[in-house]
């Protein structure tokens, strides 16, 4: 009887062993479940975010899909603390086993399978956990499914150990794990929770992150600080048991509070948000096809077509192929994009915008509109027109679109927009919670002044700073490169350049009186002037530009051809085809972007050579191989002699004219510039340049009818110039950037900007004028 029992047990055991062998062979061959092929095991599919770097190699941000914001980190870049904490907590015999820890597996089987102890710990090794993350996409929903899934993980874990070193497995695990809050992978997690690189993680910080590996939602340190701290202390205790830290270290670290340096990873936040979004749009642009554009988008089709042919960065993803023949994907291919943005200069630009626009100008604008039924629109605008504009804005909202699609009537929609509700809104002092109607929120957001700012190196086109608006989260329309506004008097340097190219000089004179020209319709046109000082006197062209005098501009326009002026403006890199060749063009009614203006003004600082904005210097793949480089694009647009004459006059704008306010900010540098203000103070401009930097700034409302009522605050010298000056002062005050206020423009020896001019005896050359220009 006993022999029969023993024989039966042996047969039963043999059947079990045979069944196990058959199961594992079947799994290994792929007959049961999914077994990845060798190629997939050797090269598991990872989706890595693209990193955008500044020129000083600071990470500006990343591009990724929402659940794949992962940045690759090599083993050598990991802190020993994170490795020790992970091994001590998750797989203490990691270096000893080959994918399956028999001791841990047996312990788990006995305590959990036979004794039903839920807190007995698991038997999964790090290799098995990695196998689960990499190749078992369908998570088991019950115990039975888990029983079938476990053997598959065991086989994959053994194969992973065969193909990879222990260090590679640890690195893969930490790169793959999702630490929540859009922090996938150890590099993003280290920055998100502690504001540092993985190699700089302290022991207690590493323990916090490893503690999340058990259950990231349960031990989320942002939501559950104390619970996460408790889990961190468990990890520290495991490190003590494993001998990685001493008893004293463990006790002192466990006593520490859990302190986070939380940095929310969001493409809408951080430094240079408008720049990053503009760059993303440029790189992912498809090849322009006319049928994809509506009738009113022909200007965009024209610009996109030129960019596709001339700009290697435009449509980069569509133009470049990977080794497997597919196009690059900026969201998953782990690219490294090295931009021309300087992180400190970018910060200075954003700080200047906040200090002047947010802290000073915006409160004044709010106060001016206080009590006005038309607010934020001009008081002179009819109430009916204000209502039309607000209704139009309402119909452009996502709320309106969704309600319309749901079948709501106009009356129902309007009622919803007039019903107060809780909401979080933007303010320059930080987001604030309030209660207002959606309609009032439209008025509220339209009350904020917008801005565009760009700064670039005239020698190579490197864009150093780029600000497209007050806050990208709430104001996503880019006023730096995308939006175009009327330029006002900042167009006058183009007019004067055309005059210099046609033989005029800064010392040529005109009588300072009203000028009447015949416009394209045969109608007399007489521009208004800001003032009548020196009325009836003979004044130089230099005086006319320095004082932004409309009569002298009209005088020159009468001597020149508006068609030639349009051609010259286009030659300066302006691509707006809707610039009409009319006599009033000399006062700047046309619309140009800040980026186009900055690029155009580089010609004045660069001996007549205009340089296009350069945003990226090189792109590397995930392995660090350089796959694209980018060079400056330059073009001579005016002669060097005309450039020197323009330098004389544009410098006078600062030293003697409308741009003199710059000097109040401690800017002593040799520079030229031009202010600009459009009708009703709708747009305020300042363009300024030194030998090493060309920068431009625009300030205006969301619409042309939203503006200051008084020129005191709405003119270019008051609204835009201070941002430029504050930025430059910060740049000059930072010696590490290498910009020097002692730098001077260089003229050819013996150059006479007034050669050939018939300035009569007795003409007064303004103080600080031609004779001592470059001393």
Protein language model features and the residues they cover:
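N-terminal type II signal-anchor transmembrane helix
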Residues: 1-53, 113, 360
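Active-site SXXK
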Residues: 85-87, 239, 349, 460-461, ...
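Short, well-structured active-site flanking segments
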Residues: 95-105, 184-187, 246-251, 500-521, ...
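Non-catalytic structural connector segments
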Residues: 118, 246-340, 344-408
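Active-site-adjacent helix/loop patches that line small-molecule binding or acyl-intermediate pockets
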Residues: 125-126, 134-136, 142, 146, ...
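Short, glycine/proline-biased beta-turn/loop segments that scaffold the active-site neighborhood
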Residues: 257, 482-538, 612-627
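A penicillin-recognizing enzyme superfamily signal
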Residues: 339, 343-359, 390-457, 462, ...
């Amino acid at each position: 009887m006993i022999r029969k029992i023993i024989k039966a047990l042996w047969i039963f055991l043999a059947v079990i062993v045979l069944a196990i062998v058959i199961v594992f062979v079947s799994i290994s061959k792929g007959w049961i479940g999914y077994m990845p092929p060798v190629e997939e095991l050797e090269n598991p599919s990872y989706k890595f975010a693209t990193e955008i770097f500044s020129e000083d190699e600071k990470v500006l941000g990343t591009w990724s899909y929402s659940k794949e914001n992962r940045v690759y980190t090599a083993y050598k870049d990991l802190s020993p603390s994170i490795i020790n904490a992970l091994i001590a907590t998750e797989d203490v015999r990691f270096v000893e086993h080959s994918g399956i820890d028999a001791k841990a597996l047996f312990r788990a089987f006995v305590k959990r399978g036979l004794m039903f102890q839920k807190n007995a710990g698991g038997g999964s090794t790090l290799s098995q956990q990695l196998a689960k993350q990499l190749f078992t996409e369908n998570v088991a929903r019950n115990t039975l499914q888990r029983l079938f899934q476990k053997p598959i993980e065991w086989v994959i874990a053994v194969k992973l150990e065969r193909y990879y070193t222990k260090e590679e497995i640890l690195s893969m695990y930490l790169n793959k794990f999702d630490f929540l809050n859009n922090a996938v992978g150890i590099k993003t997690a280290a920055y998100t929770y502690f504001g540092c690189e993985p190699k700089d993680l302290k022991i207690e910080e590493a323990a916090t992150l490893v503690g999340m590996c058990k259950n990231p939602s349960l031990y989320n340190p942002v939501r559950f600080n104390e619970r996460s701290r408790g889990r961190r202390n468990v990890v520290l205790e495991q490190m003590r048991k494993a001998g990685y830290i001493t008893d004293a270290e463990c006790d002192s670290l466990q006593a520490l509070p859990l302190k986070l340096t939380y940095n929310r990873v969001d493409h809408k936040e951080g430094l240079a948000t408008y720049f990053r979004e503009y760059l993303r749009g440029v790189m992912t642009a498809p090849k322009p096809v006319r049928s994809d554009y509506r009738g009113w988008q022909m200007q965009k089709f024209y610009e996109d077509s030129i960019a596709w042919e001339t700009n290697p960065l435009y449509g980069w993803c569509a133009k470049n192929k990977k080794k497997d023949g597919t196009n690059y994907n900026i969201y998953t291919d782990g690219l490294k994009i090295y931009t021309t943005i300087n992180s400190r200069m970018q910060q200075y630009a954003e700080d200047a915008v906040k200090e002047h626009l947010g802290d000073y100008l915006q409160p004044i604008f709010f106060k001016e509109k206080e009590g006005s039924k038309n607010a934020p629109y001009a008081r002179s605008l009819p109430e009916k027109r204000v209502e039309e504009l607000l209704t139009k804005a309402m119909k452009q909202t996502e709320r309106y679109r969704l309600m319309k699609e749901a079948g709501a009537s106009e009356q129902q929609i309007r009622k919803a927009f007039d019903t107060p509700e809780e909401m979080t809104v933007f303010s320059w002092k930080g987001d604030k919670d309030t209660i207002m109607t959606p309609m009032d929120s439209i008025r509220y957001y339209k009350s904020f002044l917008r801005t565009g700012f760009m700064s670039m190196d005239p020698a190579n086109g490197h864009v150093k700073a780029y600000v497209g608006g007050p806050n990208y989260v709430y104001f996503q329309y880019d006023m730096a490169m995308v939006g175009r506004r009327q330029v006002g008097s900042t167009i006058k340097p183009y007019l004067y350049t055309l005059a210099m190219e046609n033989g005029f000089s800064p010392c040529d004179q005109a009588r300072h009186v009203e000028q009447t020209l015949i416009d394209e319709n045969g109608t007399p046109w007489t521009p208004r002037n800001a003032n009548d000082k020196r009325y009836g006197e003979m004044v130089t062209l230099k005086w006319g530009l320095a004082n932004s005098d409309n009569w002298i501009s009209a005088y020159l326009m009468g001597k020149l051809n508006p068609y030639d002026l349009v051609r010259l403006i286009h030659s300066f890199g302006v691509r707006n085809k809707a610039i009409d060749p009319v006599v009033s063009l000399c006062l700047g009614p046309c619309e140009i972007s800040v980026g186009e203006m900055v690029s155009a003004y580089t010609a004045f600082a660069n001996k007549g050579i205009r340089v296009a904005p350069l945003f990226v210097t090189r792109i590397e793949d995930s392995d660090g191989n350089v796959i694209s480089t980018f060079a400056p694009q330059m073009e001579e647009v005016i002669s060097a002699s005309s450039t020197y004459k323009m330098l004389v006059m544009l410098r006078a704008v600062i030293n003697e004219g409308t741009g003199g306010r710059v000097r109040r900010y401690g800017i002593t540098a040799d520079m030229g510039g031009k202010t600009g203000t459009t009708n009703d103070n709708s747009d305020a401009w300042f363009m300024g340049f030194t030998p090493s930097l060309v920068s431009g700034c625009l300030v205006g409302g969301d619409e042309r009818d939203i503006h200051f009522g008084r020129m005191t605050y709405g003119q270019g010298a008051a609204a835009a110039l201070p941002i430029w000056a504050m930025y430059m002062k910060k740049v000059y005050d930072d010696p590490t950037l290498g910009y020097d206020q002692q730098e001077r423009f260089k003229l050819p020896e013996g150059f006479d900007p007034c050669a050939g001019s018939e300035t009569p005896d007795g003409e007064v050359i303004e103080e600080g004028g031609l004779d001592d220009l470059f001393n």
